[in-house]
Amino acid sequence: MKLLANIFLSGLAILACVSCSKDEDPVLPLEGAKLSVAVKASGTATKAYNPNDVNELEGEAYINNLAVVVFNETGTELLGYKWEALSGAEHSAIIADVPTTKAVRARIIVLANVPRDLLSTVSTYDEFQTRLVDLSSQSQTNLTMSSQVIVTKSALSEEDNYLGYTDLGDQNVDGISDPILLTRVAARIDLVNISTRFAGTPFAGREVRIDAVGIYNMKTKSYYFSEADWGETEAPDAVRNSEDTSFEDLLVNDGTSISNTPFVHYVMENMKSDDHTMIAVKATLRGNSSYQDHTKIFTAVINAGGLQNGYDHNFIRRNYVYRLRIYFDGESFDNIPVTPDPGPGPDPEPEVDTNLNIAVQVVGWGPVMQHPVID
């Protein structure tokens, strides 16, 4: 079983009945089956918010809406789809009566937290593969998720069909009784700790002010889904820097570290680009009677050595949390003597230092387990 988090979609039942569609549903001739999806969304064992030791933040498992799209086996024909709002993250819900026009071998994709009109613009599987989700639509309580592509080996029956219902065992389509997994398309970056190591250096007794934190080279777009379970969704290009998050009086010294996770940011998958996603920290070594303030912007690629450190990937992969710990030492700044008569000109722009001392922990997001609900 995978240790890292997925959201477990409890079951998929295909019913061979004909009934009236709701106004918002597509009106299709019902010669084949109808698709019903039963979901139970439950949280982690505890919902206490403690960003230092809980990987999943409150709301990150919410399933606000659920969408199902069904193509024929080759993906050349759209057989049916439906989008439906759900009542909340920790409530059972059913998306019922997704119409399909034919009882044939099918290609099925399940998504959560997607725009209502997404599927209405799609007519083939290849076309749907090109659709992109934007980072701006992602938030702590509305993270897009998707299943792998489910291609049935047998045709959908005109009788009832089930997929992912544990209690039904071999009665499921192709005998697939394990719950269907929904995986987030975003990743999360947490700056969990900032410290100094100035003892025995020229900066002993000094403190550092954290002025701002941002993300450089973050991917802002992703594909909605992958054919494989937890597969790649990285989109080309779409790389930019985030807006900085500014701080006031955020101070750190050898006696007082910052360990309350002052910075959290979502990004999209970025494993193949030459522009690797980086953390950027603007920090100032506080001056004293002898030395001036010295401000620099420190950067480091996130998870550049993931494989070397025992993780299963380098850089940024969807549905992971990257917990960053940084520190400043005797090599981080310069001692700049106080100038008796400083000139009237503006302060120089901070230099960029690519040698930020950083440790990266790659952790699972969740887990959140959904149990079957069969009505």
From Swiss-Prot:
Classification lineage: Bacteria, Pseudomonadati, Bacteroidota, Bacteroidia, Bacteroidales
Gene3D superfamilies in alphabetical order: 2.60.40.2580, 2.60.40.3690
Protein name according to UniProt: Putative fimbrium tip subunit Fim1C
Keywords, sorted A to Z: Cell outer membrane, Fimbrium, Lipoprotein, Membrane, Palmitate, Signal
Lipidated sites in chain (S-diacylglycerol cysteine): 17
Keyword Membrane: yes
Subunit structure: May be part of the fimbrial tip.
Role according to the record: Probably a component of the fimbrium tip. Fimbriae are filamentous appendages on the cell surface that mediate cell adhesion and biofilm formation.
InterPro entries recorded: Fim1C-like_C (IPR049370), FimA_N (IPR029141)
Subcellular localization, as worded in the UniProt entry: Fimbrium; Cell outer membrane
Pro-peptide region(s): 17-47
Lipid-anchored residues (N-palmitoyl cysteine): 17
Domain of life: Bacteria
Signal peptide segment: 1-16
Species for this entry: Parabacteroides distasonis (strain ATCC 8503 / DSM 20701 / CIP 104284 / JCM 5825 / NCTC 11152)
Gene Ontology cellular component terms for the protein in this record: cell outer membrane; pilus
Entry similarity comment: Belongs to the bacteroidetes fimbrillin superfamily. FimA/Mfa1 family.
